[in-house]
């Protein structure tokens, strides 16, 4: 018995629900000017564009990290609240990437608990972490990776900056290259995606791509009805042409 395949195509549709926590590095190395106007301000601009491209039904939270990590905005659909928090970010010493992941996971878990108390199923969650440096304080990245895997939350990472970034600390020029390897490892081992950006424009594109990946999903769509309508139209056209040709012969 031969079965006929149903004609279909793939369409991109906004996700009904999802939870995203954006974790951003605000360590002093983000003052480096290898990215114009500097890493910090370029990050702020690109992060706000990421906020704008996410579908409105996605809950978005914001975590900042330097020597410690802080949840500035719990997951919410209030985009203005997140954008305002990005505008008000401040720089500080040290880089606690591991703590940023743990804090982001806590934000996700708290939000999921709230959803469950309403009798609803928690939506899928993801962390999007941007950094330019190496973990220097707090819990190790390996511990954070284990926690993210246990929670089933992928961590997508963005390595931002060049190998030639420097920082002027009281007259001393200090190199601040990007630690790509550790950020790539976090993404690989948690099931997230890894991206690099060495300019403001590249960072904006990375965030735009992530927004598209996270905010939308590809779904098959049955187009058999279109084929049926098209087939009927062709058949009717054939009948009309046949009648016209017959009339010419008579």
Give the label of every model feature segment.
Residues 19, 192-224:
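Juxtamembrane amphipathic/hinge helix adjacent to a transmembrane helix
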Residues 28-37, 68-72, 86-94, 131-135, ...:
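Second-shell loop/turn segments in exported
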Residues 25:
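Residues that scaffold, gate, or flank divalent-cation-dependent active/transport sites
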């Amino acid at each position: 018995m031969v079965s006929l395949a149903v004609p279909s195509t793939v369409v991109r549709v906004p996700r009904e629900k999802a939870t995203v926590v954006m974790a951003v590095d605000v360590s002093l190395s983000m003052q480096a000017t290898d990215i114009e106007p500097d890493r910090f301000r370029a990050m702020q601009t690109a992060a706000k564009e990421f906020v704008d491209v996410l579908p409105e039904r996605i809950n978005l939270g914001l975590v900042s990290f330097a020597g410690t990590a802080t949840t500035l905005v719990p997951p919410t659909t209030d985009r203005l609240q997140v954008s305002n928090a990005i505008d008000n970010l401040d720089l500080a010493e040290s880089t606690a990437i591991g703590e940023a992941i743990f804090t982001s996971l806590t934000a996700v878990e708290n939000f999921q608990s709230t959803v469950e108390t309403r009798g609803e199923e928690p939506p899928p969650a993801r962390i999007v972490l941007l950094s330019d440096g190496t973990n220097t304080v707090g819990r190790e990245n390996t511990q954070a990776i284990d926690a993210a895997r246990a929670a089933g939350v992928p961590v997508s990472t963005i390595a931002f900056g060049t190998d030639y970034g420097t920082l002027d600390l009281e007259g001393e020029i200090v190199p601040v290259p990007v630690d790509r390897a550790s950020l790539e490892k976090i993404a690989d081992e948690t099931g997230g995606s890894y991206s690099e950006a060495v300019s403001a424009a590249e960072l904006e594109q990375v965030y735009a791509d992530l927004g598209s990946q996270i905010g939308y999903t590809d779904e098959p769509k049955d187009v058999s009805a279109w084929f049926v309508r098209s087939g009927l139209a062709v058949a009717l056209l054939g009948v009309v042409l046949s009648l016209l040709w017959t009339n010419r012969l008579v």
